[in-house]
């Protein structure tokens, strides 16, 4: 078993090359493109976006329309890049940040391949449901035993958890770990919030 390090330390070191890795064919990062495809297909063109574990804010390059972005990330170095893309930033762990955000405060909430780093994903998803006014896109990674054992940051497999009210819910080949070469299947989930008017 590998020695584990904090997610913040790992992602701070990764920040400068993160965009290149996402675009690298060997990483085959399909989950972000798939999320953008789902979102664009549902004709959302403006509003506020909460991007959970936003990294460098790469998502903003893929969405078609006028959006105000806020990103949560544990890595201050990642958030520096997101800020250059116009993101408002929240530098906190996902669990802490979500608990502090007001209900119905963002139109659209994205949480892409980041809940693998959160032990209590069910509570995070409850907060996401509380925060989103219009739609939610979540991707859950099917982390393999080999990946969980060998990745330097502690990770979990939440890919089989029950998700209520999903309009779309399917698996894709999500991405290949740039450090381990392990391919991870990703469950893509699209939820439209019921209007409370």
Mark where each language-model region is.
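A short SAM/SAH-binding and catalytic strip from SAM-dependent methyltransferases
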Residues: 108-120
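Conserved class I S-adenosyl-L-methionine
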Residues: 1-43, 46-55, 144
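Class I SAM-dependent methyltransferase SAM/SAH-binding core
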Residues: 55-97
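A short acidic, Gly/Pro-enriched loop at the edge of an enzyme's catalytic core
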Residues: 99-108
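Conserved beta-strand signature within the Rossmann-like core of class I S-adenosyl-L-methionine
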Residues: 134-142
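Conserved S-adenosyl-L-methionine
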Residues: 171-182
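Acceptor-substrate binding/catalytic loop of class I
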Residues: 145-162
């Amino acid at each position: 078993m590998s020695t584990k390090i904090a997610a913040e330390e790992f992602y701070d070191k990764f920040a400068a090359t993160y965009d290149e890795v996402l675009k690298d064919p060997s990483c085959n990062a399909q989950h972000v493109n798939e999320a953008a495809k789902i979102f664009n297909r549902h004709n959302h063109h403006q509003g506020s976006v909460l991007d959970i574990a936003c990294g460098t804010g790469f998502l903003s390059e893929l969405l078609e329309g006028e959006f105000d972005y806020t990103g949560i990330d544990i890595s201050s170095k990642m958030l520096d890049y997101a800020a250059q893309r116009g993101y408002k930033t929240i530098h906190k762990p996902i669990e802490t940040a979500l608990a502090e955000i007001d209900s119905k405060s963002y139109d659209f909430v994205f949480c892409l391949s980041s809940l693998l780093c959160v032990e209590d994903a069910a509570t995070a998803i409850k907060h996401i449901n509380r925060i989103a006014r219009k739609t939610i896109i979540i991707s859950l990674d099917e982390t393999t035993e080999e990946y969980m054992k060998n990745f330097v940051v502690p990770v979990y497999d939440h890919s089989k958890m029950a998700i209520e009210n999903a309009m779309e819910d399917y698996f894709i080949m999500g991405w290949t770990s740039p450090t381990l070469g392990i391919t991870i299947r990703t469950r893509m989930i699209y939820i439209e919030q019921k209007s409370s008017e």
